[in-house]
């Protein structure tokens, strides 16, 4: 086995004048771009990355992304730009889906939120605005961090002009309005929409929507046709609730919002959802939170949780943004059991729920000799959380005391500002909500958990707000020759030298890339300047370990046997942190509080068929099912309005099925083989269902030790499936209690084998090798393009929104 991996080789001279950290392994002339993985990779590229001007050439993507990022700092030289371009073009530096999608020469003039994967927020208007910008958002719902009583909000009235294209006048538009407002059962057809039902919809419309603003003392707010306008509307309501202005009336006019279906320029022309979507969200807030809080005893944290849910539903239903959320709550809160049961009771499906815990919590759980009231509370929390998680996978546990900013105390150094600067950029400025932000910032200084995580768990962020500025590097794809042509663990010395240098340079280039992104105009500009936080991490680790070092998953769990691999990982971590510190110093910015992470890497990894982040391959071979509009009639013909791709795929031999649970929709199955299955591993491939939970926890501990490191580290995002046909609830609890205290975070997801889940179909269906071969033999296709839908991008590592 060739295990040499040198930290300092080449490119280390000439630092006295202008420091050049690179080994120039990527060269300073353009290199050919790596083709995307056939099938899934190409489909994801078309769905999320390519623009018409890219002509489906990843090299053109690399050109614009490198140019846009380099434009953030005038001192970036041409040589670095070309090396950055080549690292991206080869796939060695994948950055993130956000950069690949949005990066171009306009980046210096755009807002940072379009380029950040995730964030945190301390109040609902901030969370909503970030979601509208495409961020996933985490929020802490600790009692000490929830202060707004939505029962004290003003009375809300809604206006939509009769002249607006989306105002319903005729029967067809009234039917659509009734369906969108959920007055009518989904799927109600035109022929069933009789005069009586139409009258019900008209009555609802007259009760809830005014055609013009009333005259009088009411406060009128015209909602602007922009993300900023929608965010400001919620800010106005939330700020008035914080001030206790229940006796006032706020009139919200939706008439300036563009009609549904209009293109959104900043989202590659994707269709706008129109005013009815926001109207529906605010109606739900009025009825299910404001009025409910006035009528009953709804705690403040639950009010906030429900407001955030109803607003994020509208972001997700719009279809152009993902609306991923993380909701956390301290185990110490007296009402945490209600939070734990919230998902079990149904309805709150837009957020992943986790309980923030610490070493004291685990001591109480694991030491039954302790019998004080807090110990009893901890054990009750653990028992109830694991009972609920055993049923639906939530809540999880996050070890808040192990998160970097809490561990070091840096989170408590954040200053409190009363002028709204904590949420201010050129595009959006918090005005009405400034006092609320200041109040919450002051509370956070003494909060037990001043930091939380983003929805995927890989970045530590202050509870009052911060960003995930993150990117992936793929060490396998830094190989200067086709990995399939390399004998695993026996890499020729010349090839190994270039390969290793490229890996090192991809880390250096990636760190600098992310630190430049921190220079963008940002809502959380104060926090970005304070922390200069980034997160760079590897993806395709299992493929790299196999081809470069000849090691499979179980080899990696043996530190002695896998020493060459783990030494390489540790040295890359050192490079990342050293380069981050040096580049921050050179550019006059703060030393980054965090540098290393491992993110889920779903989109970026799929482009090239890699295992995602730290995850094991989910399956050896599978059918990827994608929904299309249209069904076949009994006579064998396709219904009018059927997507023309459906009959095309069927003629080519792809499996096609009509759905019962989604009327009017059919699915097409695309045979998929991950890259790791094409590298000669054979039976040495270990899939996630084949690895024991203890093995996977050990893998996470090693990644935290060697890559995350003792300082300047975030977390490893990881979903560990525990199959309920192999483990009982008691063994599940024992496994969590024994292992979860020793990692920063890990999503443990009880599940059943695909065949036992009871769904009509799953986005990815594992099939036997024989069945897979039979299916592929039936397909005659050299031309038809595959597609991908949101289900596959959101199911990156097994956490599916089903």
Label the predicted regions.
Residues 1-802:
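Extended catalytic cores of very large enzyme megasubunits
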